[in-house]
Amino acid sequence: MGKSESQMDITDINTPKPKKKQRWTPLEISLSVLVLLLTIIAVTMIALYATYDDGICKSSDCIKSAARLIQNMDATTEPCTDFFKYACGGWLKRNVIPETSSRYGNFDILRDELEVVLKDVLQEPKTEDIVAVQKAKALYRSCINESAIDSRGGEPLLKLLPDIYGWPVATENWEQKYGASWTAEKAIAQLNSKYGKKVLINLFVGTDDKNSVNHVIHIDQPRLGLPSRDYYECTGIYKEACTAYVDFMISVARLIRQEERLPIDENQLALEMNKVMELEKEIANATAKPEDRNDPMLLYNKMTLAQIQNNFSLEINGKPFSWLNFTNEIMSTVNISITNEEDVVVYAPEYLTKLKPILTKYSARDLQNLMSWRFIMDLVSSLSRTYKESRNAFRKALYGTTSETATWRRCANYVNGNMENAVGRLYVEAAFAGESKHVVEDLIAQIREVFIQTLDDLTWMDAETKKRAEEKALAIKERIGYPDDIVSNDNKLNNEYLELNYKEDEYFENIIQNLKFSQSKQLKKLREKVDKDEWISGAAVVNAFYSSGRNQIVFPAGILQPPFFSAQQSNSLNYGGIGMVIGHEITHGFDDNGRNFNKDGDLVDWWTQQSASNFKEQSQCMVYQYGNFSWDLAGGQHLNGINTLGENIADNGGLGQAYRAYQNYIKKNGEEKLLPGLDLNHKQLFFLNFAQVWCGTYRPEYAVNSIKTDVHSPGNFRIIGTLQNSAEFSEAFHCRKNSYMNPEKKCRVW
């Protein structure tokens, strides 16, 4: 057919004929060989570098961990001289206690960060929110609604006072208004049954220690208006607090009288409030010291109401006090009838004996002034700015803070404390990595196993008691993260808060509603079985717990984060962080309190006499050790080695178990890669991370407060005391014998 129509055009290029090829010169050959050699070397180096492992972890998580550890520590301090300064010196230089805080530390920073998460989830309205969550958000909005709160002044409180027989000092003609109807039984019971406020006599419904599936009525000494009985000495370091306390009473009484348009007699206010202080001082002196209340066996005194009437008769306002009427006044609010045969556990027989001569000295007016005040003082910070400010000097004397906590923080905490499951749901949905649960379960299994293996090393405990200790350890139930129900069972969560209905412009009434709801719920338990599966903590909490009555350990979602735990951080840090916390909580089942309860949570002596005696002897070592620490921030006072014993036993046991579990991990999985920028191996990093959990400091006022009220040793002594007893620590840091961190005498219980 001839040429194709789509034929391509070809351009013909005439190329010249090549010249004759030239030979390479020696220089060119040499250079070519050199280039070839350099290329081979470069390729080899690249290949080697790509596969070379210098043993240092360079992941972003490792870099973050290393940066945190380096920032917090002071490497110029000798670790064997003062490990607190070595581990926390950098933290102390970089951090100042906020004006709103009584203390500040890594624990508090985690709590601050958790509060930010709570604020975000509580202030965000969502159309798909279930009713329980809607209620939590409404409660939060009512709490931050400062304009509504301020506009009401003290009116919500004034409306409430007649319900509790008024406050005599702020009432005209109190005797005429209330005197005829006032009885001690009714007045004390009203505060208790409606609002959960226990003054003079602390009656409550709780688990029966000796039969932990049942509830029983307990009678105990009351809490005080000041942090501890020591404050009522009102001299030296306690003088300012006593003065501020009485001034606080007078200020609030004055504000109420002003609002009620009543005449103000300053002398009369001072006279009556000083009388309240005098009465409370006597009550405080009648209470037992904490160190005398450490043995649950001695604390437990079960008797009938008839026996209480016989053993602890009281006379108030010239009339005999009826224990039966008093108890029925409280329990009738939840439709429970009590007879003289009702069993009651008395925790404070000595207090009730000492109470009798005190109460005969004071009039109904004096007693009601104290009782109403103790209720009012709790509510002042829920009123307008003027009322809040009346508390400033008192707050400063007790906590050293010069500013109030930010409203949103206080409100986030308040809602979390009252609706822990609704808030817990919001928190875990926003911030909790679910895979953490399985990793922590595995850690618990490892540390429980180490605890049981360690029993074999104990020479002070006989075989019979060891066997029972093992049974108890195996029976410990664990709770990790959060109860599944709070996320998966909408109906159950809604039903939990069914009776609660909040108004956004009535914060005070919402608080009262919560008090009534919570107290009613607790009183109703008297005729119910104990729910042993119930969680003893909400999810949005940076803490961990052990319940002796349930033999249960709890690790809420809030604590499962760095520095305690991360599935991505080095295992040495996890074992030194959450591993130590797990060991600590397990050991609580065997401390000076927990050891008295059996595997089912009942108060039963399961120890042979010899083992019990040896336990006390071993413990005494720690009582002396921690009791010899003096705290400069608390005016040089010594720690109370008896009151902090349980926590110190748990710290020491927990650290030892976690370290042994980490050694087992290394044997099984091999050494981990080192962290960048730190000239420390992983054994050393284990102890460093443990210590940095406790970096922090206190205001002097709060140090004075906590040394009397906190069952934990201050953070610096938790580090020093525990590590002084650890031979493994001294080995890891090569501490010479008898250096400060490596004393020859070491204490060990578990």
Swiss-Prot record:
Cellular component annotations (GO), alphabetically ordered: axon; brush border; cell surface; centrosome; ciliary basal body; cytoplasm; cytoplasmic vesicle; cytosol
GO MF terms, alphabetically ordered: cardiolipin binding; endopeptidase activity; exopeptidase activity; metallocarboxypeptidase activity; metalloendopeptidase activity; oligopeptidase activity; peptide binding; phosphatidylserine binding
Family: Belongs to the peptidase M13 family.
Predominant place of localization: membrane
Active site: 585, 651 (proton donor)
Cofactor binding comment, as recorded: Binds 1 zinc ion per subunit.
Activity regulation as described: Inhibited in a dose dependent manner by opiorphin. Activated by K49-P1-20, a twenty-residue synthetic peptide shortened from the snake B.asper myotoxin II.
Glycosylation: residue positions: 145, 285, 325, 628
CDD domains in the cross-refs: M13
Record PTM: Myristoylation is a determinant of membrane targeting. Glycosylation at Asn-628 is necessary both for surface expression and neutral endopeptidase activity.
Catalytic reaction annotation: Preferential cleavage of polypeptides between hydrophobic residues, particularly with Phe or Tyr at P1'; substance P + H2O = substance P(1-9) + L-Leu-L-Met-NH2; substance P + H2O = substance P(1-7) + L-Phe-Gly-L-Leu-L-Met-NH2; neurotensin + H2O = neurotensin(1-11) + L-isoleucyl-L-leucine
Source organism of this protein record: Homo sapiens (Human)
Protein's name according to its UniProt entry: Neprilysin
Biased segments, Polar residues type: 1-14
Subcellular location: Cell membrane
Amino acids binding Zn(2+): 584, 588, 647
Entry keywords, A to Z: Cell membrane, Charcot-Marie-Tooth disease, Disease variant, Disulfide bond, Glycoprotein, Hydrolase, Lipoprotein, Membrane, Metal-binding, Metalloprotease, Myristate, Neurodegeneration, Neuropathy, Phosphoprotein, Protease, Signal-anchor, Spinocerebellar ataxia, Transmembrane, Transmembrane helix, Zinc
GO BP annotations listed: amyloid-beta clearance; amyloid-beta clearance by cellular catabolic process; amyloid-beta metabolic process; angiotensin maturation; bradykinin catabolic process; cellular response to cytokine stimulus; cellular response to UV-A; cellular response to UV-B
Lipid-anchored residues (N-myristoyl glycine): 2
Top-rank EC class of the record's enzyme: hydrolase
This enzyme's EC code(s): 3.4.24.11
Requisite cofactors: Zn(2+)
Gene3D superfamilies xrefs: Collagenase (Catalytic Domain), Neutral endopeptidase , domain2
Annotated Peptidase M13 domain residues: 56-750
Motif (Stop-transfer sequence): 16-23
